[in-house]
A protein has these predicted regions:
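Helix-start/capping segments and mature chain N-termini
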Residues: 1-119, 123, 151-275
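Intrinsically disordered, low-complexity linker/loop segments enriched in Gly/Pro
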Residues: 126, 146-148
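Short boundary motifs at domain starts and secondary-structure transition points
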Residues: 130-131, 154
Length: 275
């Protein structure tokens, strides 16, 4: 998919870069961020002009609905650099479409393609030096949207902020991942928001994952909420199981996130290509 470009976008450049202060060989996932971020507000029923500005904290009303009712969604993807210094993304259109599906489920406005994809393209152009070549080096991309409208009435917000921040990264896991099967806690339920990449889906996993970590496991493979006998997905990924020469994976439904890697692999698993 060709990335769209924005006809209008305000760019405020950082006074200086902190890139030379970063040890790219010893990164903790998600703790270091690039010099700039994309910000675009939704108010009065319309998306405003997006801005790329220096990465920094921002002010928000204490009564904003994101704090009280969890109206927040996000995506996660990575940029890679090849030996010719070209920057690549893996099917970002899928993340864009999934982001808007999550927005719809959470009663949030969909983000236009030119703001999401065009803004991402421009941000990556500015921050291309943060994408390092070599095996294991990536630039993690975190698009997200939060409800910024003030007031504690239990209703959808009328104002939102869409942002994209970037973080240089290496492997999320440094070695093999030890998992435990969920027998009590559930990630999602029928009729819930399991298929949305909503912030609350992840915070709800923190406590059972903490218990699993204390037992020496890095991740939980979640099971259905009714019987805990049907394997669904892990906390950070979809999963496949190989039994002899057959691969098994749960069908996507309203409880399971429709993973981009999973979706991309399925055609080749169902219809193998001779090599």
């Amino acid at each position: 998919m060709e990335l769209k470009t924005l006809s209008e976008i305000e760019i405020i450049s950082a006074a200086s870069s902190k890139i030379n202060e970063v040890d790219f060989e010893n990164l903790t996932f998600g703790n270091v961020f690039t010099d700039h971020m994309l910000v675009c507000d939704y108010k009065d029923g319309a998306w405003q002009k997006p801005v790329i500005e220096p990465y920094a904290p921002f002010m928000i009303d204490p009564s904003s609905k994101v704090f009280h009712y969890g109206q927040a969604i996000f995506e996660g993807m990575k940029a890679y650099k090849d030996e010719q210094d070209a920057v690549w993304l893996f099917r970002p259109d899928e993340n864009f479409h999934r982001f808007n599906k999550s927005a719809s489920r959470m009663a949030m406005p969909e983000v236009p393609e030119d703001i999401f994809m065009g803004g991402l393209h421009k941000l990556l152009e500015i921050e291309k030096d943060w994408v390092k070549k070599g095996k294991g080096n990536t630039l993690y991309i975190r698009p997200f949207m939060i409800a910024t409208g003030h007031g504690v009435i239990a209703a959808p917000s009328s104002e939102y902020r869409f942002m994209i921040i970037l973080s240089p990264a290496r492997a999320y896991y440094s070695g093999e991942v030890k998992v435990i099967i969920a027998e009590h806690f559930s990630r999602a339920a029928n009729g819930g928001i399991g298929a949305a990449k909503a912030a609350g889906n992840y915070s709800a996993q923190f406590y059972p994952t903490k218990l699993a970590n204390e037992k020496g496991f890095q991740q939980i493979i979640w099971t259905d909420d009714a019987t805990h006998t049907k394997l669904e997905e892990a906390g950070t990924m979809n999963v496949f199981f190989r039994i002899n020469d057959t691969l098994f994976t749960a069908q996507t439904n309203k409880r399971i996130l429709d993973g981009v890697t999973r979706k991309s692999a399925e055609p080749y698993i169902l219809h193998p290509i001779a090599v």
